[in-house]
Amino acid sequence: MSDVDADEARKMAERERKKEEVRKRLEEASRMKKAKKGFLTPERKKKLRKLLMMKAAEDLKQQQMLKEQERQRILQERIIPLPDLDNEDDLEAVYDEIRERLIDLESENYDVSYIVRQKDFEINELTIAVNDLRGKFVKPTLKKVSKTEGKFDKLKKKEATKVDFRAQLKVVDKNEFALDEEDTEKKEKAAWAK
């Protein structure tokens, strides 16, 4: 019995030793895989992505804050604070001042928009000239047309027959509405025909 127990213990020890070897090989292989992946492991990638998103969100908030400050500054410049008005003369003076400012701003706006239109036209002309020199021409954008729409149009045309409204009218033999010129032409012959 001791031989059987010893033999069984030896087999168990052999199995344990083989399991340990397999475990070591798997650990070695996993270490090799990690070593091959390089510096950026999935955890590091996730952390880096999170940091980048936080930085981008912070930058976006900063930009929005700067834009809002710029907007407030410009509004403070442009908006004239209304004074306390005691009588009509003060009101007319404020009205005249605001009207003059409005006229100035509108004329500036018109001048700027005119310059922009001129520049756009010039840019377009130069683009056309460059394309002509290169030999490249701008292809016009085509509208998308569905195939089924054309088929439906053909079916509608076949179904819709021409309606002749004159056929429904009553025939009148009187020549009340006929022109008199036709009768005179028949009676009178041309000078050369005589």
Swiss-Prot record:
It comes from the Eukaryota. Disulfide bonds: none annotated. Residues 7-27 have a biased composition (Basic and acidic residues). Keywords: Actin-binding, Muscle protein. One of its GO terms (cellular component) is troponin complex. Gene3D superfamilies: 1.20.5.350. Residues 1-27 are annotated as: Disordered. Expression is detected only in pharyngeal muscle cells from embryos to adults. Troponin I is the inhibitory subunit of troponin, the thin filament regulatory complex which confers calcium-sensitivity to muscle actomyosin ATPase activity. Belongs to the troponin I family. PANTHER family: TROPONIN I, TROPONIN I 4. This is Troponin I 4. It comes from Caenorhabditis elegans. The lineage of its organism: Eukaryota, Metazoa, Ecdysozoa, Nematoda, Chromadorea. The gene is tni-4.
